[in-house]
């Protein structure tokens, strides 16, 4: 058995095909081109742009990606049918991912054919695709449950007929790492890819095991998107190879987080907060012991530097926070409390945490201002707010605010009243800089139709990030309150930074 990786390892990204099969996800041709361009910039080798046989829109997407001049190979999914192959070639694809069911379950139940019929279909399709001038990756669907001698026969003859690459598809996530180590080596008739699903949580580990066993390419999706529990995650695999095995993947790792958030925004599938590498909590620390350790030496509680994947470390404060973490956070905010003031601030933060409150940056500032008796004049004050929305009306918001003493009125439309309100606020402060809404969440604190809602937002400006919240019975006003609190924090920090620079 091969025990070292066969380098360089290639990455075949199927976010635009298998990832788009995530329930509820549907990308436009323009959105697909955006993601494909970002993938190519990050350094993936092959982009599966979709299935040319699926729709006119899919063919438009494939054509646009093929014509974009990207460094990555443009591939399309095809069945073992001449019509599928013609559509792929006519759309301008460089290669085809020729998928053929190889388990008896799929052959008999899905296709209602015999092994002999399926294998001949596969080989004939390989020959036809080569006649059309395409690179061919012959893929065994449900290979984990296939008779391995039959799979080897399909692959061996497929290569004889012209297949350039092979792919072992663990279609429902049943392949284990130890089994992958045993069954991959006998299938290396040509460069072999591994395609894993994460139904039982083994996708990443099995992909690594297959690569160690001689596979040279991994099929992945951004954020682990895919049917059911998803596919092996690009960002997790890249960093596992780099950090744990010292492999130079050739991927621009500092772009992994921007790519992840880009895909999350376009697909509408939010990132799990505790997702490795790209989740909100991946580089966030609250516990006093952990936070203190990280502040002294980040490697005490982090496996890699967050900057390596385009992230920043966050120390958040709550009931588990110790004095050192609170003092460091206050220092970053421009506060220098005395020992007695620090103790009081820590006690108040812990009381809020014990009450079940999520503590935002704006909360901490308010506590510090109160304890240290600092008079704070907000940079932004709301004077008037109007929202128009209805079944036949485009949601429109207008807002009048005092921004650093100047009265400014702004208006905007949105997909809904909350969206319109936030856009109006952003437009009103445009003269003092672009404030971006990175995250928005809402919870009902009480029950009933008059429920008190708690809106939390994360805003950023010029590389700085802040969290804030608002609580009202009116979700729109709670959102406005949260955004204004965050904007005030950002503008206040900016003012203090400039004051320090002038000193």
UniProtKB/Swiss-Prot annotation:
InterPro entries in the record: 2-isopropylmalate_synth_dimer, AIPM/Hcit_synth_CS, Aldolase_TIM, Citramalate_synthase_CimA, LEU1_arch, LeuA/HCS_post-cat, LeuA_allosteric_dom_sf, PYR_CT
EC number: 2.3.3.21
UniProt pathway: Amino-acid biosynthesis; L-isoleucine biosynthesis; 2-oxobutanoate from pyruvate: step 1/3
Disulfide bridge partners, by residue number: none
Record carries keyword Transferase: yes
Enzyme class: transferase
Complex formation: Homodimer.
UniProt protein name: Putative (R)-citramalate synthase CimA
Organism: Methanoculleus marisnigri (strain ATCC 35101 / DSM 1498 / JR1)
Lineage: Archaea, Methanobacteriati, Methanobacteriota, Stenosarchaea group, Methanomicrobia
Record gene name: cimA
